[in-house]
Design a protein with these regions (language model features):
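Histidine-bearing beta->alpha loop at or near hydrolase active sites
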Residues: 464-477, 506-507
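Catalytic-loop region of hydrolases
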Residues: 23-105, 120-129, 276-279, 287, ...
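A catalytic-pocket lid/entrance helix-loop region that shapes and gates access to the active site
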Residues: 209-211, 216-326, 469
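Short beta-strand/loop motif that positions the catalytic acidic residue
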Residues: 430-433
Length: 549
């Protein structure tokens, strides 16, 4: 009876906290909640169908083991593993894992996955570009495999099962969330006061799904370089592959005229860094003044064309990489363009080592985005495993392909500007891109952010979203920042941190201040390892926007 009363009391306290103003909630670092159950009592715990917002056959805890953190010997947690069972008996289970700290800060963080998922993300690390280990900070940390199991994250064959595909698209997120709430409530006697999500790439797409589709349930979200323009990015992979390989015919002409060998690609990148590195005030191998560099791209392109004897076909490949493409028709979300990358400003084009296209395309040998696009078109969009990616006209699709593209955009894209539920829930979003990301275009993510501003206005967007773009950052790599602490301050106090926020740059090991868009990091003098030696400049060449973005 005493245990029951204690659990009820703690649940009532949690409810009071949830309805209190944000200013009344202690920070994570000031909160410690202890379990009300023994860890082993979780084993065999059934999660009823009624606990899930989406249709399932319930869930179950399979194992629960007390574990000591590998990075902090004073931190102990319960490593919980479980299943969420599908309605379709031929569909895979959702496998999830949850870390429950013995000293809990009252918050949870759900970590997103990568590529086509198929495995549970690592829960004991810092996550995408993170600077903090969440379990060591007292967070409940959890994640799932997106609703199927695969040896390779590139495997898209699971999509032949409708429930598995629906789970991957978005449903696994809220199902895992519901499992977390149920298990957490059982173990601590209450749900989290604040529920966070953090992810990059596919995990970034998942982050935006949480903010838009499930915005009423999440309090703070970190979204890193999201694969949110899902159909457009996979079409970019198809169009880039065509630019590289369209001349290839194994019998008549076994050459890919658009292919650029790896040595030349690396030399172009080195030339760009050498030319633009000092524009930010310091030569440190990081191109920070991306705007001035991009405004010079026509001159730079002329230089490298002459230096390396680039052909018309090779220039087309570079054009697709740098500028993306524009369609005469729009996706279901209204977008008709993919804006390309910083390929001529120090980014690394990845065309693979081999000019011979495999079938299916293989990223070990071929264009990096080719195999990802190939799998998505085969299993997600066309449902045709014999689809040959480079054999179709994406600029002028026939009616059948057009209809499939529209249906796919409606289902898979995660670039909705509808944050009404998230805003009403007082949700907070940190949105992040890297100038050197060659997987998810920073220029495309800028366009997406502008869509938010167009819908809500800058002042309203600023109240729930901070958008940073940083130099020297590739795809979910190259930087470490304490975004969990920033989100916690924002959600707990109602105010975003007012002090200058710094991140650690992998390229130098030093710090730089976070550059809120459209700012860029400028060196002012002093110790280059000290973030205080930099400022955030908003100096942008006249006429830049609408021409070079």
């Amino acid at each position: 009876m005493k245990k029951w009363f204690l659990a009820l009391l703690m649940a009532l306290m949690a409810l009071m906290l949830s309805v209190a103003s944000a200013e009344n909630v202690p920070l994570a670092s000031e909160t410690e909640i202890n379990p009300v159950l023994e860890a082993q009592t979780l084993v065999g715990l059934k999660i009823p169908v009624e606990a899930f917002k989406e249709t399932t056959k319930g869930g179950e805890v399979i194992s629960a083991e007390i574990t000591t953190s590998e990075t902090d010997a004073e931190v102990q947690y319960v490593n919980v593993f479980g299943y969420i069972y599908p309605v379709d008996e031929s569909a895979p289970n959702i496998e999830w894992r949850m870390l429950l700290p013995m000293k809990w800060n009252g918050r949870s963080v759900q970590l997103g996955g990568g590529a086509n998922n198929g495995s549970i993300p690592k829960l004991t690390g810092t996550g995408s570009v993170g600077g903090e280990i969440a379990i060591d900070k007292g967070y409940v940390v959890y994640g799932d495999d997106s609703g199927h199991q695969a040896e390779s994250s590139m495997d898209a064959s699971f999509a032949s099962n409708d429930e598995a595909l629906s789970n991957y698209t978005r449903l696994h997120l809220i199902k895992a969330y519901d499992a977390m709430c149920y298990v957490t409530n059982a173990f601590y006697g209450q749900e989290p006061v604040f529920k966070f999500f953090a992810g990059g790439s596919t995990g970034g797409r998942e982050a935006l799904e949480c903010a838009t589709t499930y915005g009423k349930y999440y309090d703070g979200i970190f979204c890193c370089e999201p694969a949110s323009n899902y159909v457009l990015i996979r079409m970019w992979g198809a169009i880039l592959s065509q630019a590289v390989y369209e001349s290839y015919d194994a019998e008549k002409y076994p050459y890919s005229d658009g292919f650029i060998d790896e040595d030349t690609v690396k030399a172009i990148q080195a030339d760009a860094v050498a030319l633009y590195d000092g524009l930010d005030g310091i030569e440190d191998g990081i191109v920070s003044n991306i705007y001035a560099a991009r405004a010079n791209r026509d001159n730079f392109l002329k230089q490298i064309t002459e230096k390396y004897g680039l052909t018309k076909a090779q220039l087309k490949t570079i054009d697709v990489y740098e500028n993306g493409y524009t369609l005469d028709y729009a996706m279901a979300n209204g977008m008709n363009a993919y804006h390309g990358y910083s390929a001529l400003e120090g980014g690394a084009m990845d065309l693979g080592p081999d000019p011979v296209p495999r079938e299916p395309l293989d990223t070990t040998y071929n264009v990096h985005h080719g195999d990802r696009a190939d799998g998505v078109f085969k299993y997600f969009i066309t449902k045709d495993p014999n689809w040959v990616l480079i054999d179709h006209d994406y600029y002028h699709p026939d009616q059948e392909l057009y209809d499939m593209l529209m249906a796919a955009s409606e289902e898979y894209d995660a670039n909705s500007p509808e944050f009404d539920d998230f805003i009403a829930n007082n949700g907070k979003l940190i949105y992040f891109a890297g100038w050197n990301d060659m997987s998810m275009s920073p220029w495309q993510l800028i366009q997406q952010y502008r869509g938010y501003v167009e819908k809500y206005g800058q002042e309203k967007v600023d109240s729930f979203c901070k958008f940073y773009v940083m130099p020297g950052v590739t795809h979910t790599k190259g930087i470490a920042m304490n975004y969990l602490s920033w989100l916690d301050v924002w959600c707990s106090t109602g105010e975003y941190p007012t002090e200058t926020l710094y991140a650690t740059m992998s390229a130098t090991g030093g710090q730089m201040p976070m550059a809120e868009f459209p700012g860029w990091v400028k060196y002012e003098g002093g110790d280059p390892m000290d973030g205080a030696s930099y400022s955030i400049s908003t100096e942008i060449p006249d006429g830049f926007w609408g021409v070079y973005d």
